[in-house]
C-alpha cells in the first residue's frame, strides 16, 4: 500500500474517472475512499497508522478492496483540526461495479 503524506501528493496521484476496455466491455474506473480513521497527536503517525491499516486489510471489506482494486490502494494523511491529531483515508481505484458492490455491502457496517 502506497502512502501519500500531503494533500498535494494526493492531488498529483489522483486521476479523474477513466473508461477502460476490460474483457471486451467498456468499464468506468475511478478513485474511492474505502476506509477512514482518526489518530491522536502521536510522535510518529505513520508508524502508529500501520496497525489500523493492517487490521482493516484483514476484514472482509479490506480483503474485497485488496482483491478488486485496479492498482495498489494508498493512504492519505491529513491534519485533524478538531483534536490536533491526524485523519487517515485509504483510497482505492476500482471499477464502478465493484464500487457499487462495496458501497451496498460494506458502507455503514462495522466490517
Describe the predicted segments one by one:
Residues 80-111:
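Short, compact, well-ordered microdomains
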Amino acid at each position: 500500500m502506497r502512502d501519500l503524506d500531503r494533500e498535494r501528493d494526493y492531488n498529483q496521484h489522483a486521476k479523474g474517472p477513466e473508461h477502460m476496455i476490460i474483457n471486451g466491455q467498456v468499464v468506468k474506473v475511478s478513485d474511492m475512499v474505502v476506509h477512514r480513521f482518526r489518530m491522536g497527536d502521536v510522535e510518529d503517525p505513520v508508524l502508529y497508522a500501520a496497525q489500523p491499516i493492517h487490521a482493516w486489510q484483514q476484514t472482509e471489506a479490506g480483503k474485497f478492496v485488496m482483491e478488486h482494486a485496479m492498482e495498489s490502494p494508498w493512504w492519505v494523511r491529513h491534519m485533524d483540526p478538531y483534536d490536533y491529531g491526524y485523519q487517515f483515508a485509504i483510497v482505492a481505484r476500482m471499477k464502478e461495479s465493484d464500487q457499487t458492490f462495496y458501497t451496498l455491502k460494506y458502507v455503514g457496517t462495522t466490517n
